């Protein structure tokens, strides 16, 4: 199957609630490659590489997030790169 890379940005109460770690676990469960990081503007940014079906599943998870999160929006757009494994990146 053809793979794509998407950039997803979660808005709302998504920092300090375990969102990044839970998102990385969800991405691992979906066998996606890529990374996740906090941004100084209070969002969480994800670059994910996989099939459209896998990416749509991650987007659906991100729209809900872990129980303590309150997600108001998940922006989705094209991303760059191909990744093996999923990692944490430093905050920017």
From Swiss-Prot:
Start and end residues of each Acylphosphatase-like domain: 5-90
Keyword RNA-binding: no
Keywords from the UniProt entry: Hydrolase
EC number: 3.6.1.7
GO molecular function terms attached to this record: acylphosphatase activity
NCBIfam families associated with the record: PRK14430.1
Family: Belongs to the acylphosphatase family.
Protein's name according to its UniProt entry: Acylphosphatase
Source species: Cupriavidus necator (strain ATCC 17699 / DSM 428 / KCTC 22496 / NCIMB 10442 / H16 / Stanier 337)
Gene: acyP
């Amino acid at each position: 199957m053809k793979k794509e890379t998407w950039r997803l940005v979660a808005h709302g109460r998504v920092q300090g609630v375990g969102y990044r770690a839970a998102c990385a676990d969800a991405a691992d469960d979906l066998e996606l490659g890529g990374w996740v990081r906090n941004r100084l503007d209070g969002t969480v940014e994800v670059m994910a590489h996989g099939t459209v079906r896998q990416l749509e599943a991650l987007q659906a998870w991100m729209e809900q997030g872990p129980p303590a999160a309150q997600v108001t929006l998940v922006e989705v757009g094209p991303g760059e790169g191909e990744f093996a494994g999923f990692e944490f990146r430093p905050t920017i």
